[in-house]
């Protein structure tokens, strides 16, 4: 392979579905073309929202070939805020401001609005991934200088990518999430038997309260999610944000679009009072994992969030033999429900030498605190001790 050529493109449509998915695949719902294009097409990732597409496309030709083929892609956005990232750098932005400098724009490689780890740099088997990463890094440094961008942030890459990017000079950061693992359970009751008596009783009590209220649940696979479901779901979705004085990042058109373009990776769990939907949660899935992402309800019903978003999701994983369940960022209340702490990763390059050193020192100091937090969280897990 020789004559590598890198382009920054302002729309994933410039690369195209076949080309992008040819490298990225479709198993990860948040990095497949359909998801990223739906965000862009419906106005969720645009310059006005602070997520301007700036995707990376690398082309190369084999010695005997006359034309160049796409050999690598990477999602990239030029950002003018830090919303929808879930790796928090607001304090860094404030520090820049205190010194009369601008932290924005910055570059971010991520699945927008999605705190879920996965591959971020997709390469053809004919090229060396480290070489491609180095090329992107070099070109991005040049682009950052020309656009006066402060930094580049790679959010929720795999552990292997985190190490690769760190090796070429992009600082590494860790954080913690809580995921549930399906250890070949045949039923939810079998899972409960792995918990200590007190936690098992607490979960049963919570579920019993929901049942006594007469609430029932229905799982709607993606192809069967109709306009009426999207309407009520979107009302709930926005109400969740409104309670915090915010507006949801995503439009109803976005949800309708992914419902059309990738229904096989979606399912919705709705809670019913008689025939009336009183809550809804939208999940994604791939061949091994479920991802709980968005939820809302008509009002605050005790334990309904836990049932709809966690217990129903766990039951779905058991029934469909999915190996794990990523229910989103944060949430220490998940620990007592069997969600285990896992490490997540990010990488950060800072253009300003002074700030780069300060942030590097911060990351070094932060890492043992994250490890200690993860250990403490693991010590609180409700599983029975092996005798």
Protein language model regions, located:
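N-acyltransferase acceptor-side catalytic subdomain
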Residues: 1-387
């Amino acid at each position: 392979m020789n004559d590598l050529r890198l382009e920054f493109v302002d729309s994933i449509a410039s690369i195209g579905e076949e080309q992008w998915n040819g490298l990225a695949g479709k198993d990860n719902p948040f990095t497949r073309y359909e998801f990223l294009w739906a965000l862009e097409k419906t106005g969720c990732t645009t310059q006005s929202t602070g997520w301007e597409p700036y995707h990376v496309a690398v082309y190369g030709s084999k010695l005997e070939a006359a034309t160049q083929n796409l050999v690598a892609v990477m999602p990239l956005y030029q950002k003018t805020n830090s919303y929808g990232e879930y790796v928090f750098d607001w304090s860094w932005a404030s520090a820049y401001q205190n010194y009369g400098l601008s932290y924005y724009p910055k570059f971010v490689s991520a699945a927008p609005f999605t705190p879920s780890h996965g591959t971020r740099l997709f390469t053809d088997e004919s090229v060396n991934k480290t070489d491609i990463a180095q090329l992107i890094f070099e070109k991005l440094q040049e682009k950052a200088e020309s656009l006066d961008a402060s930094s580049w942030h790679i959010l929720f890459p795999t552990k292997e990518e985190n190490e690769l990017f760190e090796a070429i000079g992009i600082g590494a950061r860790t954080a913690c999430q809580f995921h549930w693992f399906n250890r070949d359970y045949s039923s939810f009751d079998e899972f409960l038997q792995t918990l200590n008596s007190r936690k098992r009783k607490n979960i049963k009590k919570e579920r019993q309260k929901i049942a006594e209220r007469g609430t029932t649940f229905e799982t709607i696979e993606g192809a069967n999610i109709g306009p009426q479901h999207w309407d009520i779901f979107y009302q709930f979705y926005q109400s969740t944000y409104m309670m915090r004085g915010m507006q949801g990042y995503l439009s109803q058109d976005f949800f309708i679009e992914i419902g059309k373009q990738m229904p096989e990776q979606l399912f919705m769990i709705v809670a019913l009072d008689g025939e009336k939907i009183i809550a809804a949660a939208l999940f994604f899935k791939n061949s091994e994992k479920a991802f709980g992402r968005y939820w809302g309800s008509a009002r605050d019903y005790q334990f309904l969030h836990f049932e709809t978003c966690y217990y129903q999701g766990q039951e779905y994983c058991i029934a469909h033999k999915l190996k794990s369940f990523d229910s989103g960022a944060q949430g220490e209340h998940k620990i007592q429900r069997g969600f285990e702490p896992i490490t997540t990763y990010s990488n950060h390059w800072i253009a300003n030498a002074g700030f780069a050193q300060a942030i590097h020192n911060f990351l070094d100091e932060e890492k043992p605190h994250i490890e200690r937090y993860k250990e403490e969280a693991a010590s609180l897990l409700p599983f029975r001790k092996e005798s």
